[in-house]
Amino acid sequence: MNPTETKAIPVSQQMEGPHLPNKKKHKKQAVKTEPEKKSQSTKLSVVHEKKSQEGKPKEHTEPKSLPKQASDTGSNDAHNKKAVSRSAEQQPSEKSTEPKTKPQDMISAGGESVAGITAISGKPGDKKKEKKSLTPAVPVESKPDKPSGKSGMDAALDDLIDTLGGPEETEEENTTYTGPEVSDPMSSTYIEELGKREVTIPPKYRELLAKKEGITGPPADSSKPIGPDDAIDALSSDFTCGSPTAAGKKTEKEESTEVLKAQSAGTVRSAAPPQEKKRKVEKDTMSDQALEALSASLGTRQAEPELDLRSIKEVDEAKAKEEKLEKCGEDDETIPSEYRLKPATDKDGKPLLPEPEEKPKPRSESELIDELSEDFDRSECKEKPSKPTEKTEESKAAAPAPVSEAVCRTSMCSIQSAPPEPATLKGTVPDDAVEALADSLGKKEADPEDGKPVMDKVKEKAKEEDREKLGEKEETIPPDYRLEEVKDKDGKPLLPKESKEQLPPMSEDFLLDALSEDFSGPQNASSLKFEDAKLAAAISEVVSQTPASTTQAGAPPRDTSQSDKDLDDALDKLSDSLGQRQPDPDENKPMEDKVKEKAKAEHRDKLGERDDTIPPEYRHLLDDNGQDKPVKPPTKKSEDSKKPADDQDPIDALSGDLDSCPSTTETSQNTAKDKCKKAASSSKAPKNGGKAKDSAKTTEETSKPKDD
């Protein structure tokens, strides 16, 4: 295609690109109506020639129309390929029919020829060239596609399109594709496998198969029935064997053809050779006379009688349905009256209860031995039960009673578990040996559980019993372990009598010796006046009476150079400050009473809450309104501090180590009892927390005897 030819095409015809989809429909109409529209084409061609010069400068002014046309051509590419191919076929016919009248027609025809040339010259692989050439060439034919009735409308549209500019021509449109031809060699063809069917077997392979099987040509259809000889050969093939001869070649061929008909080609190839060898062996051994004799023994084949369809009866569906028949005896109703169990009735017609079974009597040892010895001696019969019973009575007197009880169970177990000896299997066990063995056994004691039926045993085991533990309640405590309380006439429990002997009043030396054990080393036994038992009791009483002085004296003694005699003197003076021990009223009460008293919530008056509870020693302080205060302890303290260290009181020397109990040195001997008890109550209060009421009670009790 030359660039001059593309320029000669009017711009208005090039801009008719959007009408490309309608080109295929009106292609044939353009050929038929072309002679009728010669006048219109001549007029339009003149108009296009005049405005072709105006369209060229407009091509550069409006470049935006190019992408619009390119998008339309790209979307309609598939339609253009088919249309161009058809237009190329119709082009020679159009050229022959069109008369060569005017140069204006030649221009339009030249545009059509250019489109045809581009379509023909383009090769199948030139896809780019087709896209470029279709855009200017195809719109030429869109002009005469319109029918004759719409000629005025087409002219108006053409005039309107002429005002628009054409697409810019680029160098790519002028370039031609010079590369190799593009072809699509891929094609899907179905190739059948060789030998899958008989038709696909090559002729050379058929000749090889025919030679191998001994078949020269295609098998002929043998519709003849098999004779008696052939049937005999077929039946007797499994019974005979021998060397092959040339007598039975015809039967081989006929039988092989039958096999070929029934089987496929693959099975014929593998199965035919062994059949030939086998049948050659069979036919040689049998002679014709033997075959004739064998065939004569067989009768003639009788034709099967044809079935008479009239004799066949149709089965009704209703009768053919399955019916469920009850078996005899499956239900109680189906049991015949003769076989039914009739319960035994009494005179009144009530059924009689079955008699209770007699309890089996305890078997003797001899009976058990007889039962056990049956396996060893099968020929021996059972003896009468009377004979062994007499012997068991004799065995009672002979065997001692204690031995019989111990031997009874152990001997039976040994008999049951002992393995059979091989010597006993040969002969029978003599009766004397069995009797001697029975005499050595004691009498079996009757088990009380043997008489019970099995059901009762199972029920007893299956029951779940809730048993109270021993001692869980007071009722379950055995009487030997119960605590018996001694009560008086009123029913109140009596206090146990004091078993301890009342100790004589303790001297100061004894108390000092008991208290000074922790401070000094071991003393001689001659210094003590009482025995060791009384000393231990006295020490425990002193400790319980004065807890403040004893419990808090945990500090180690000073390592001084004083002698033991000085310590004894100091302890003697310290013991003088202690009062005499008073009996505790709560000491003899039982433990149960103490627990009950503690559990009860009682209101007790606090010390000093009322005037009655104030101790008499402190009442004068309230009467004097706090003016008179005890000045004696500080005066003593000041006097003692003025004394030299050598003349110091031994009580102060000992009490210096007791940091937690300084009240003993400050108080006088007259008020020593009250203050020591107060110090004990004050020391117990922070430890026990909520036990201040009990301490107040003790102070009240100590104050009352003083008032008396």
From Swiss-Prot:
Region called Disordered, residue ranges: 1-187, 212-404, 416-527, 543-708
Role played: Specific inhibition of calpain (calcium-dependent cysteine protease). Plays a key role in postmortem tenderization of meat and have been proposed to be involved in muscle protein degradation in living tissue.
Residues carrying N-acetylmethionine: M1
Keyword check for Transit peptide: no
Protein name: Calpastatin
Residue positions, PTM Phosphoserine: S87, S133, S222, S243, S364, S366, S373, S440, S516, S527, S563, S575, S577
Species assigned in the record: Homo sapiens
Modification Phosphothreonine occurs at: T135
Keyword annotations from UniProtKB, A to Z: Acetylation, Isopeptide bond, Palmoplantar keratoderma, Phosphoprotein, Protease inhibitor, Repeat, Thiol protease inhibitor, Ubl conjugation
Disease linkage: Peeling skin with leukonychia, acral punctate keratoses, cheilitis, and knuckle pads: An autosomal recessive disease characterized by generalized, continuous shedding of the outer layers of the epidermis, leukonychia, acral punctate keratosis, cheilitis, knuckle pads with multiple hyperkeratotic micropapules involving the interphalangeal joints, and palmoplantar keratoderma.
